[in-house]
Curated annotation (Swiss-Prot):
GO molecular function: structural constituent of ribosome
Gene: rpmB
The entry's keywords: Ribonucleoprotein, Ribosomal protein
Record protein name field: Large ribosomal subunit protein bL28
One GO biological process term: translation
Pfam families, alphabetized: Ribosomal_L28
One CC-aspect GO term: cytosolic large ribosomal subunit
Source taxon at top rank: Bacteria
InterPro entries: Ribosomal_bL28, Ribosomal_bL28/bL31-like_sf, Ribosomal_bL28_bact-type, Ribosomal_bL28_sf
Family in the record: Belongs to the bacterial ribosomal protein bL28 family.
Amino acid sequence: MSRVCELTNRKKSFGNKVSHSNRKTKRTFLLNLHKVTLTSDILNKKFRFRVATRTLRTIDYKGDLDAFLLNTRTIKLSEKAQKIKRRLKKVLVKQEVELAVSDA
């Protein structure tokens, strides 16, 4: 299992460890990944992800998984998240069509 966020595709980053004497040595910054189950209200389905805590905070800020996926640019999402986003959009379009038909 690689240490990659399954929603945003974030990977480990690289940098320098700087000592008190300002000596620099190479190091890696690993993600703080957690296994979580997130629920989609629109699809009425649960999804399991390995997600970075930064992504979890963003999901909380946006409101829920659906709002996060719909408000995030597709380029920034992983393949798995892009598939879920496409399914969300299909369901939303279908609901709008049903509303338009029922109003007419």
